[in-house]
Amino acid sequence: FSEAGDKILVADWFWAPYNTIAREIGRSVETFELFDDKRKFNIKNFSAKADSLLEKQERLVIILNTPAHNPTGYALSDEDWRNVVNYFSSVSKEKKITLLADIAYIDFAGDEEKYRSFLPIIEEAPENVLVVIAHSLSKAYTLYGMRCGAMICMAKTEEIAAEFKR
């Protein structure tokens, strides 16, 4: 979903092993400022950093750790998610974006309905965006050390699903 030498976009508050994982597969991590000066999701910086990377590379992997972002506890609001999807709609269709929503801590976020309401919103992402949901049983079911989880692909076409399976 990316090429050797590409940068992966993550928030500036992130799980440090992303650096090691990226380096081991020939990528590197680029960060955007998670919060603006009002302590809200910084869509402007997110968009600017994504635009900058897409000027240099054909594909972009974006990791958003939400809800119950580790380490801040922050959760993108439905409005934040709409802004992210709207940003994706503004990007050239020739560019390929993979959005990895790391929802490892979703079961610790609180109100189930509230913190799952983003799912129908990200279904609206355009076809050039592959949405992948990463869930961890080690967190949700306290199976620490088991390293058991799932990746769910929200593909709009059979071709995209086939690419995900490879």
Residue ranges and their predicted role:
Residues 6, 27, 92-97, 129:
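A short helix->loop->beta-strand "cap" motif at the edges of active sites that frequently abuts
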Residues 10, 31, 99-101:
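Hydrophobic residues in well-ordered beta-strands that form the structural core
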Residues 1-7:
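Phosphate-binding glycine-rich loop
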